[in-house]
Amino acid sequence: MLSKQIPLGIYEKALPAGECWLERLRLAKTLGFDFVEMSVDETDARLARLDWSREQRLALVSAVAETGVRVPSMCLSAHRRFPLGSEDDAVRAQGLEIMRKAIQFAQDVGIRVIQLAGYDVYYQQANDETRCRFRDGLKESVDMASRAQVTLAMEIMDYPLMNSISKALGYAHYLNNPWFQLYPDIGNLSAWDNDVQMELQAGIGHIVAVHVKDTKPGVFKNVPFGEGVVDFERCFETLKQSGYCGPYLIEMWSETAENPAAEVAKARDWVKARMAKAGMVEAA
């Protein structure tokens, strides 16, 4: 029987950079995490993972089996560079091909959830056409994911198109597909003018995972825990009382820090203390 403890994971970019997943998962285990979320961002180096050989994919599966630390989710932010809403047909086609490869990769290595970035476009000007193309691209993507039995989950973003659970639910209702769900970031959700607790309650039944980070209005990255506006204890209480039992992922970008492991351990202790106050975990 699976343990009733809260699954707590760490973002790949919080840990030292490199391509050795056995080392990364061993470190995550030492730090007390249950899982690591993989990043496939817009850089060529991380995009290249989608073209890994069979042997490279098997090495990841083997590392998971050896350490017991899972890689159940992928943060797919590559669509900043190749957006599904692009008015350039070649760029949009590339975005759909990245989606196809990501779904195939997930199927091969056991990733269950691909977190999507809710940008119709990122470096270009958005308009009605980019949003229409984005919707159509999502529909095509969810069709692919359905066939592969891989869940696509929309992140709540640092971008007005997808800055609330209510807006993301609109896409969930439009797509009406069990393989499309929500992956809120309580930091991003709190940085906008949202009723955060009401939004979290509205998403219950569609939330498959939760990103945990601190933010300030207009500042969505690298805000030290406790220095931003997120009311972590209330968010954790709301999710617990609403019946959410899924994973939480600490999102950090400390891979280039002098001592990433120390930064992560400090953040882990801070977050777990707030979880304990919310009655989610036992106090240390």
UniProtKB/Swiss-Prot annotation:
Its EC number is 5.1.3.22. GO terms for molecular function: intramolecular oxidoreductase activity, interconverting aldoses and ketoses; L-ribulose-5-phosphate 3-epimerase activity. Pathway: Cofactor degradation; L-ascorbate degradation; D-xylulose 5-phosphate from L-ascorbate: step 3/4. Pfam families: AP_endonuc_2. Gene3D superfamilies: Divalent-metal-dependent TIM barrel enzymes. It is an enzyme of class 5 (isomerase). Keywords: Isomerase. The keyword Protein transport does not apply. It catalyses: L-ribulose 5-phosphate = L-xylulose 5-phosphate. Belongs to the L-ribulose-5-phosphate 3-epimerase family. This is L-ribulose-5-phosphate 3-epimerase UlaE. It comes from Salmonella paratyphi A (strain ATCC 9150 / SARB42). The gene is ulaE.
